[in-house]
Regions:
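ATP-dependent carboxylate-amine ligase catalytic core
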Residues: 16-18, 22-38, 63-150, 166-168, ...
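Nucleotide phosphate-binding/pyrophosphate-handling subdomain across enzymes
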Residues: 38, 133-138, 145-156, 160-161, ...
Length: 430
């Protein structure tokens, strides 16, 4: 199987969408010898911040000399971003070998989803690489997420907000219950959740399972004074949660304070308050895609660029609270340029422009038919911010040909078929 054939096979699995439940993933893992049983995990869930928290954890452990595995989603440009060993994306040739092996061993009656199959490929890759610790991000929710077949050394819940409500529930409490599904008997749970109703759900579940619950609150964040590479007050919360987790697990992975500070100072996470220069232009890219994420982006923008109002390039998905997010972002801009996301779920630019005008946002809005047109429209602007969707961020990075500092973005390796693998759709009955 070639790399192109492996990606085509994975793309074909995306037709099965999201199928809640763990049976398929368990059967897939069993077919290749349950590689998860040879690995040690930190399992991270949350509405926002889980990827950043995983990135902080990975950076600190790598600074201390541990061999790390990092599993996150979605990818921005290249599939290998999802599965990393020592912060290096999975090579396409390795992906092809693992996909081929799993496909051959898969039970004939099984029709796994893209994410279920990818999750087991990640387990195979990490076991083969003999990593010391796996930073293991959930895909959607927690309780029924494919990643939940593991028993970790610690479970981590970053934040709880309203997102994916069509699957996880319509209230913060219901969503918290789904995220709390990653808590395992006797395994410590660490959380920076600050909503009282959500925190109560997590603490109740921890008591039920005799799991020690550590709450990282505002006081703990204020005591964490080490420099953090990622911008925004929300990233200081994520960094503090990661530090507390590393300290709790020092019996398994000794990490000195020197390595903690090195890791925090050198954490890279593309598309999350990512700043770079292109000639005279400053670019700021952030994948905020729900109300809480947009609020955090606004705060970070004000804190770090208090006297600057960027031209904002927006691309949004229809199954998000896009009207609310767009109108909340508008006051922070000098003007807006809106474009479609390469997804059937995109909000059309004219519809987004009309919604902003109806909301009397007080800013000029230009609707563009493509990402390329939107980027041409801002070529002379000194400060450009791009937000609204992680998928949109990936498209912009690809079009700009920008290699992000972590070396993860390789525009030559990207393509429409790879990007469509980011898509989430409800499962068809099977």
């Amino acid at each position: 199987m070639t790399p192109a054939e492996a990606l085509a096979y994975l793309h074909q699995l995306s037709q099965f969408g999201f199928q809640p439940g763990l049976d398929s993933t368990r059967r897939l893992a069993a077919a290749v010898g349950n590689p998860q049983e040879r690995l040690r995990f930190i399992h991270v869930a949350g509405t926002n911040g889980k990827g950043s928290t995983c990135a902080f954890l990975e950076s600190m452990y790598r600074a201390a000399g541990f061999r790390t595995g990092l599993y996150t989603s979605p990818h921005l440009v290249r599939f290998g971003e999802r599965i990393q060993v020592g912060r290096q994306p999975l090579p396409e040739e390795t992906l092809a070998l693992l996909v081929s092996e799993l496909r051959q061993r898969m039970p004939a009656d099984l029709t796994p989803t893209f994410f279920e199959f990818t999750t087991v490929v990640a387990l195979m890759a990490f076991a083969e690489a003999a990593v010391d610790v796996v930073l293991w991000e959930t895909g959607l929710g927690g309780r029924l997420d494919a990643t939940n077949i593991v028993t970790p050394l610690a479970s981590v819940i970053t934040s709880i907000g309203l997102d994916h409500m069509q699957v996880l529930g319509g209230t913060v409490g219901e969503i918290a219950a789904e995220k709390a599904g990653i808590i395992k008997p006797g395994v410590p749970i660490l959380t920076s959740v600050d909503r009282a109703d959500a925190l109560a759900v997590i603490q109740y579940r921890a008591r039920e399972l005799d799991s020690h619950c550590v709450v990282v609150d505002a006081a703990a964040v204020s005591r964490m004074t080490w420099p953090v590479s990622l911008l925004g007050p929300h990233q200081r919360v994520n960094a503090t949660l990661a530090v507390v987790t590393v300290r709790l697990l020092r019996a398994f992975f000794p990490v000195s304070d020197e390595h903690l500070t090195q890791g925090l100072a050198h954490t890279l996470w593309a598309g999350r308050m990512q700043v770079f220069q292109r000639g005279e232009q400053t670019w700021l890219l952030d994948g905020a895609h729900n109300a809480d994420g947009v609020a955090a982006f606004r705060r970070a923008l004000t804190d770090h660029f208090p006297d600057r109002h960027p031209v904002m390039v927006l691309g949004m998905l229809r199954d998000k609270a896009w009207r609310e997010m767009a109108t909340h972002l508008a006051p922070a801009t000098s003007r807006l340029v809106v474009a479609p996301v390469s997804s059937p779920r995109t909000v059309q630019p004219e519809e987004l422009r009309e919604a902003l005008q109806e909301a009397r946002c007080g800013r000029a809005v230009r609707a563009c038919a493509s990402v390329e047109e939107a980027l041409r429209a801002v070529t002379r602007e000194p400060f450009v911010a791009v937000t609204g969707s992680l998928y949109f961020i990936g498209e912009v990075l690809e079009r700009l040909g920008e290699i992000d500092p972590s070396g993860l973005v390789d525009s030559s390796a990207a393509g429409d078929d790879q990007r469509r693998l980011n898509e989430w759709t409800p499962a068809t009955p099977r």
